[in-house]
Design a protein with these regions (language model features):
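Solvent-exposed, non-transmembrane regions of membrane-associated and secreted proteins
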Residues: 4-151
Length: 151
């Protein structure tokens, strides 16, 4: 009986800690987003491979869709580019799953370039595709996929 109670207590603590970590990561992402937005120029400035260095993170762009406001960086803990795709950390899976078909996703690069995409929710897939731009989030052994159609 005591062992069962102890197991329940430990699992509750681990669940609470994972929720706290997820909240903290989202809060840090919001802070980076708010610091990045004023630094992006209104007009396009020709540059290749440009980034901003904020709090030790190399920020390439910001991403907006609905209530989601993220930065795109070059490290695994942030949304980042891989080929034509945007890879989202697993901690942001719930936010990714909240996206709906036909939502408009906007990316503002640090060069001032703005690109808009329409969201097409695909769901679970086994591997990343290189055929068209997509947003992927690791979901266990598979990926949650959203195709991005340029508007």
């Amino acid at each position: 009986m005591t062992l069962g109670c102890l197991c329940i207590l430990v699992s509750c603590c681990l669940f609470g800690y994972s929720q706290y970590r997820q909240y903290k990561e989202i809060k840090n992402m919001q802070t980076l987003y708010e610091e990045t937005i004023p630094l992006i120029p209104d007009n396009y400035i020709s540059s290749q491979g440009g980034y901003l260095d904020l709090q030790g993170h190399y920020i390439e762009a910001v991403l907006e869709v609905g209530s989601i406001h993220w930065v795109i960086g070059d490290e695994e803990t942030l949304p980042h580019y891989k080929n034509k795709n945007i890879i989202i950390p697993e901690s942001l899976l719930k936010q990714v799953q909240s996206l709906k078909n036909r939502d408009i996703l906007t990316i503002h690069a640090v060069s001032g370039e703005t690109i808009k995409y329409q969201v097409e929710v695909i769901g679970k897939v086994d591997q990343l595709s290189k055929s068209m731009p997509a947003l992927y989030c690791k979901n266990g052994s598979s990926y949650y996929c959203i195709n991005l159609i340029k508007v």
